[in-house]
Amino acid sequence: MGYSYTEKKRIRKDFGKRSQVLNVPYLLTIQLDSFDKFIQRDPDGQQGLEAAFRSVFPIVSNNGSTELQYVSYKLGEPVFDVRECQIRGTTFAAPLRVKLRLVSYDKDAAPGTVKDIKEQDVYMGEIPLMTDNGTFVINGTERVIVSQLHRSPGVFFDSDKGKTHSSGKVLYNARIIPYRGSWLDFEFDPKDNLFARIDRRRKLPATIILRALNYTTEEILDLFFDKVVFEIQGDKLLMELVPERLRGETATFDIEAEGKVYVERGRRITARHIKALEKDGVKKVEVPTEYIIGKVAAKDYVDLESGEVICAANTEISLELLAKLAQAGYTAIEALFTNDLDFGPYISETLRVDPSCDRLSALVEIYRMMRPGEPPTKEAAEGLFDNLFFSQERYDLSAVGRMKFNRSLGIDSETGSGVLSKEDIVSVMKKLIDIRNGRGEVDDIDHLGNRRIRSVGEMAENQFRIGLVRVERAVKERLSLGDLDAVTPQDLINAKPISAAVREFFGSSQLSQFMDQNNPLSEVTHKRRISALGPGGLTRERAGFEVRDVHPTHYGRVCPIETPEGPNIGLINSLSVYARTNDYGFLETPYRKVVNGQVTEEIEYLSAIEEGKYIIAQANANLDDDFRFTDTFVTARGEHGESGLYRPEEIHYMDVSTQQVVSVAAALIPFLEHDDANRALMGANMQRQAVPTLRADKPLVGTGMEKPIALDSGVAVVAKRGGTIQYVDASRIVVKVNEDETIPGEAGIDIYNLIKYTRSNQNTCINQIPCVNLGEPVGRGEILADGPSTDLGELALGQNIRVAFMPWNGYNFEDSMLVSERVVQQDRFTTIHIQELSCVARDTKLGAEEITADIPNVGEAALSKLDESGIVYVGAEVKGGDILVGKVTPKGETQLTPEEKLLRAIFGEKASDVKDSSLRVPNGTSGTVIDVQVFTRDGVEKDKRALEIEEMQLKQAKKDLVEELEILEAGLFSRVRNLLVDGGISEKELDTMERAKWLEQTLSSESKQSRLEQLAEQYEELRKDFEHKLEVKRSKIIQGDDLAPGVQKVVKVYLAVKRQIQPGDKMAGRHGNKGVISKINPVEDMPYDENGRPVEIVLNPLGVPSRMNIGQILETHLGLAAKGIGEQINIMLKQKQDIEKLRGYIQKAYDLGGGSQVVDLNTFTDEEVLRLAENLRKGMPLATPVFDGADESEIKGLLELGGLPTSGQITLYDGRTGEKFERPVTVGYMYMLKLNHLVDDKMHARSTGSYSLVTQQPLGGKAQFGGQRFGEMEVWALEAYGAAYTLQEMLTVKSDDVNGRTKMYKNIVGGTHYMEPGTPESFNVIMKEIRSLGLNIDLDEA
């Protein structure tokens, strides 16, 4: 494989034995594709906005004389870009304009004669747009819409598994779930009658539904039963014989024909008997007359003369009835065929409990159940039933629902109507009865073929449709009012309901979540998350174990490892690396096709439904050079996901990759295969909580997934087109695009502006740092600048730390960690956190609040960091309690005495009627002010500071645009120069001439002249574009801000806090090995090796065996080897050894082991080898892909190559005494993360503060500035010690003795340290509670 210039800077050695068949797909596809389908630049009418409009329009008035038709829609351009929306706190959205046509028909002329047509563009609110990285900016914050895993529409057959009824009888049920509309359930009761429920209301006999569908009793029986025909011949009774029906029954009489006895009475009828009957062609058999008793008539028998019904359908036949029928001249009687085994009489029994007798009574019954208390009329009852399942407006199975419905019932076609038909309902009942009769299986609801993904686009479309339906009602009313001559479509449509529905969904839906922006991995994982919760989904409380459990169909679709711990376990999942959704919303995963035991390059995506039919081999099955299986038997997954051994020719597909099973986060854990699943779960979850460190450090031991995640997360800057770096500084990169990638007639310059020190959602710091140098070539899609937690385009969440597994004076008891002071000094885990504090000046009833430096009763020192406008300077170092923005609020006028009024009038003292409400730094916080923004309402005069900021922004914007213009001009003029030199004008002449004049030259060649004219036009275009951009930018900066009602001004102050690591901070590895720092130890006290090199962190060896996460030990060994090789390269570089020797050593390292990666350093120039060596000095990065990683021999080989002991253990010496430790210790390099659980955020202290209203006890928690709870057990502890006075203090003055604590405070202030405890408030509360129960208690002094 050839490496590009950028890739050659640092190559990660890959231990993977299998070459990558399929590259990791773009990780945010699920979000971006879904939203693209919703917005659809060229609508197809099947989905998205277009489908929503078409489903609601045209809206016809009640009398049919006018209709409002939909023509097309257009999304405008958003006013502000993403960055501006974040700063201003607005939503990144585009206006939606819809072209509508109002058509009036002539009432007097023939139907359909058009009288008038009005067409108009109507504004229908704003649609939030998705950013390039799959997020939405709503009110200035980035949010993610999580995809939902919900039950697919269709029909499901299930059973209660014998849990409902005390007898343990299994009751079966069927449920038809539409995409929207009423649910229809059928269920058996313990007596085997079949009932129906609509929308989970009370049950009705299922035959009521059939009667409402206009079936008669005879037709119903005909649908569900086979018939038995009895013939009356004189006093004999013959039965038509179908031998197969007799199988398994016991003969109650001799079965004989033509004198031959086939089965004697009392014998069980077997297959041998049936064969004999069939062979002799026995068609009829004589039965005793009693045999017909209890059989059920299949149709009505009427007296042909009188017309009287002798025997109605579904009536049990008795001897009297038989005699009557014979008398009436009937020679053949049809009865229902039922038996106890596999043809139950369920429908027949249900008809007996059915109160209705015809269609109307059935409809009335349904109406009464759906609308209790309303008097039913025929029209209302019919309308209700029709609307329930047969109306396009009210009921929609959707394409998915119809496909699942037809597949479940074995109908060939996958398409059909969105509403139910008579046949559909009958087919569901038939299948349910078949299952009850023992034919057919119930469905597995947790199978991923029965659960589908609803992504952003689909959910937004549903919300939009809800808004449209609300509008439709209003428009219908308006159309029916008449007098439409002067009305335009704009007058009819009120866009508020639509924008309200959309806003509600994006702003406050359970699935619209505040983006987890801790680091690039947490962003990617959040966008790939799949939740079973949310509207139309499950709730935590109701979800059982089955739903949460790993299902065989999760393989390759949903990660079995990554899911939260706690109440949401198993309900929130993560998409596997290669998974995607198909058109129906079911998850698919890719497989390589296998033909006759040979694995092909062809890749097919299979959904869980299709996968069940095939046998699929694992990705680690052994193949020869012709891609044939080498083993006689191959481990593979058969039907139902069960694993087994199969012959190669039986196999249909093979997995694409070993990491296909797991999610992105789990695929980042090296040696995942050696970790216990519970710990791997913690490891995957904790990587998302890693805080980006000051300097990112790539992991020495990775898995090869680091690059795709960093690129796809969008935090790094990636080249849109290939070219050469023309200019680079901390905030901008300019690329001169390659000739073959430029569009004719453009300057061929790409400018990338970098994000500097911005706040993320989690208050971590987002900063981009260029990683290219001037003049370097870059290819398309290559990395230009690293974002937070990325290092040369690879994800770098933590730091490579030298660790030792050994106990050290109890400082690593219970997972604590002992950290060397050097880690703190080198700022390895120092992080920057940025806080946004805002101050809002509102209009109050007593007057406007004012932002000012003139604050009453505040000393000069407190105002030292404020400017004249009362706003803190950028760069000021502030600590808890400092004023950031001075603000005063008008106080209510107190009643003044006449004397005070006189003094006020004379001296005009106004200062006393305002109170200080300034924005101060929260307690316990300190930092540096890095930015201040002032937003002023339109029409309110801007203060000096706001004008300064505005001027600065204008200057910066102009400077940026001018620089951009200069760069583009330079690119353009270099082309002009080349053209003119080609055209015969000397370079000297050009150098003396002004550049603008170059464009006025005339060239002899006509083609060159036209090219020059083209370039001149381009130059004009550039200037115009520059003017336009500058004007737009200027107007955006100058215009007032759209603030909330009643808000005059908002000031936002950004504080940056640098946090070093300290005892109490939480750290973790990638294998679920988490712990808290117990002590920061001086370097000289840390254990050191023979070379005098101390370790940086000491971990407890007891944390490994019981947790079974051995991956961390292997990582430590491999990390040591990686570092060892880096050391060897470093020595060679320092000694300035021969480049060939260096090349040979590095080549040896890359060639070691049986990996599929090929790195040929002979194709590298000496300069490239040196640059590679320079980047490998600190250690050679290694990749050990999950389930396909380095084995023991490779680790040992690498350790040997690095000149290290192959045991991975080293003799250590005690830093304090210099004594050798008793035995060798495992030492190596582990990738450690600092998690976002910092002791600074948790630490909290209180002396006095707020109290709860009823109990008068201090509140709890840091956010409420609460106290420490002294609970029941703590009271026992003090009782056990007999510390009576301490206990009294705890229960009274320190808690809820109101008077006592006030006196105590006064005493402390006065310097007399004694307390006077009184009655605790909670005692009064309990007294009141007892009185509220009607028991009076009086307290008498003893």
UniProtKB/Swiss-Prot annotation:
InterPro entries: DNA-dir_RNA_pol_bsu_external_1, DNA-dir_RNA_pol_su2, DNA-dir_RNAP_su2_dom, DNA-dir_RNAP_su2_hyb_sf, RNA_pol_bsu_bac, RNA_pol_bsu_CS, RNA_pol_bsu_protrusion, RNA_pol_Rpb2_2
Family annotation (Pfam families): RNA_pol_Rpb2_1, RNA_pol_Rpb2_2, RNA_pol_Rpb2_3, RNA_pol_Rpb2_45, RNA_pol_Rpb2_6, RNA_pol_Rpb2_7
GO MF entries: DNA binding; DNA-directed RNA polymerase activity; ribonucleoside binding
GO cellular component entries: DNA-directed RNA polymerase complex
Catalytic activity line of the entry: RNA(n) + a ribonucleoside 5'-triphosphate = RNA(n+1) + diphosphate
Enzyme type, top EC level: transferase
Keywords, alphabetical: DNA-directed RNA polymerase, Nucleotidyltransferase, Transcription, Transferase
The keyword Transferase is annotated on this UniProt entry: yes
GO biological process terms, semicolon-separated: DNA-templated transcription
EC number: 2.7.7.6
PANTHER family reported in the protein's UniProt record: DNA-DIRECTED RNA POLYMERASE I SUBUNIT 2 (PTHR20856)
Function as written in the Swiss-Prot or TrEMBL entry: DNA-dependent RNA polymerase catalyzes the transcription of DNA into RNA using the four ribonucleoside triphosphates as substrates.
Similarity field: Belongs to the RNA polymerase beta chain family.
Record note on quaternary structure: The RNAP catalytic core consists of 2 alpha, 1 beta, 1 beta' and 1 omega subunit. When a sigma factor is associated with the core the holoenzyme is formed, which can initiate transcription.
Protein name, per record: DNA-directed RNA polymerase subunit beta
Name of the encoding gene: rpoB
